[in-house]
Amino acid sequence: MCDLIEPQPAEKIGKMKKLRRTLSESFSRIALKKEDTTFDEICVTKMSTRNCQGTDSVIKHLDTIPEDKKVRVQRTQSTFDPFEKPANQVKRVHSENNACINFKSSSAGKESPKVRRHSSPSSPTSPKFGKADSYEKLEKLGEGSYATVYKGKSKVNGKLVALKVIRLQEEEGTPFTAIREASLLKGLKHANIVLLHDIIHTKETLTLVFEYVHTDLCQYMDKHPGGLHPDNVKLFLFQLLRGLSYIHQRYILHRDLKPQNLLISDTGELKLADFGLARAKSVPSHTYSNEVVTLWYRPPDVLLGSTEYSTCLDMWGVGCIFVEMIQGVAAFPGMKDIQDQLERIFLVLGTPNEDTWPGVHSLPHFKPERFTVYSSKSLRQAWNKLSYVNHAEDLASKLLQCSPKNRLSAQAALSHEYFSDLPPRLWELTDMSSIFTVPNVRLQPEAGESMRAFGKNNSYGKSLSNSKH
């Protein structure tokens, strides 16, 4: 079903520290031209096509970095207690660090923007790219723990961009989340993955320049409450699975799937974004943190302390997002603590045991006496709108499996009967081709939407009027 991403042996941990120093120091040596190959040497350059277990991937090392250069990268020890109540209740908030505009603040009291004809984002080619003065900041979109995102404009070609400005601290070096995101995205070219245009490094900041994307799925669902048009759900889900299949085939996990990390362009394209927590097997790590996915979209195996991650980790999030798009509410909106989150899952899927989930008793935080014993129920009993859409309940049930080994992979999900009424050409597209280049593939107006919001010049007919956990 899904590919296992195994933790690395303990003796390789030293390599991780060396890699962090190498990558962090390397940012100060990046030439200011986008086409410079120095940064490529930092990235994963070859991924084996063999089964993920036992895969040896190749990283090019930078022999030019002096060994006496000590670049400290902050490491924090996790104090995660899965049953400790958080200081505040979990609440739905919009993303502050993805490459999109805050829809509510920009569109209140206005008509939904008209859609534009689809066009693939163009990569900068001018030698002026890579320079800090090549971009103009237009407005602040959000701020996270280590980065601030601005809407910007290229002074070279006038295109809108999203500027993710990462603050550097001399004593700590470059944040490793930034290194991960930049190094992974540099090698990912797909219509359903946000495009990294440029990298700008100064003494104080590291700026990642992304294509500008109009909104995100969270804001889109907030704009259209009560569940999305079934046809639109299908197209969004298809694009999500396309993007995931692409990265999973390269043994990369996203690890932070949630609606606010799924960007929606004004042509209807869905793009995976925010790869700060993404992990490639080629980056050595003794264990993976279990504090990686927002609570509502975190799979039960991770909640129970498993660190043996596979691509199935992402597939649980897909199932949660699928249900949320159809039903109009989060699938498992835990409000108290980890225990409450697990109870909400078990209430629908049944409390696991060794018969239904072999190995569950060996998970660090599984204590049978802590949980009420529930029997599983059909998903339509929990989310009635699944019954209105052909094959939706069956697909959701194959994604929302407590045992990770039983979850459908992204590639297998794309072949599910739920998608059988889509044009066959969608499965023949090249990686960088949008699904909206296929005739008659278009988003439908959401309930209550004014037809004036749909561009008359849209070559695909009716299309998108745009609008968390």
From Swiss-Prot:
Serine/threonine-protein kinase activity is promoted by associated cyclins CCDN3 and CCNY and repressed by CDKN1A. It is a peripheral membrane protein. GO terms for molecular function: ATP binding; cyclin binding; cyclin-dependent protein serine/threonine kinase activity; protein kinase activity; protein serine kinase activity; protein serine/threonine kinase activity. It comes from Mus musculus. Its EC number is 2.7.11.22. GO terms for biological process: cell division; G2/M transition of mitotic cell cycle; regulation of canonical Wnt signaling pathway; Wnt signaling pathway. The lineage of its organism: Eukaryota, Metazoa, Chordata, Craniata, Vertebrata. The modification Phosphoserine is found at S24, S78, S95, S134. Pfam families: Pkinase. Residues 103-133, 449-469 are annotated as: Disordered. The keyword ATP-binding applies. Keywords: ATP-binding, Cell cycle, Cell division, Cell membrane, Cytoplasm, Kinase, Membrane, Nucleotide-binding, Nucleus, Phosphoprotein, Serine/threonine-protein kinase, Transferase, Wnt signaling pathway. Its main location: membrane. Residues 135-419 form the Protein kinase domain. GO terms for cellular component: cyclin-dependent protein kinase holoenzyme complex; cytoplasm; cytoplasmic cyclin-dependent protein kinase holoenzyme complex; cytosol; nucleoplasm; nucleus; plasma membrane. This is Cyclin-dependent kinase 14. ATP binds at L141, G142, E143, G144, S145, Y146, A147, T148, V149, K164. Residues 456-469 have a biased composition (Polar residues). Belongs to the protein kinase superfamily. CMGC Ser/Thr protein kinase family. CDC2/CDKX subfamily. Gene3D superfamilies: Phosphorylase Kinase, domain 1, Transferase(Phosphotransferase) domain 1.
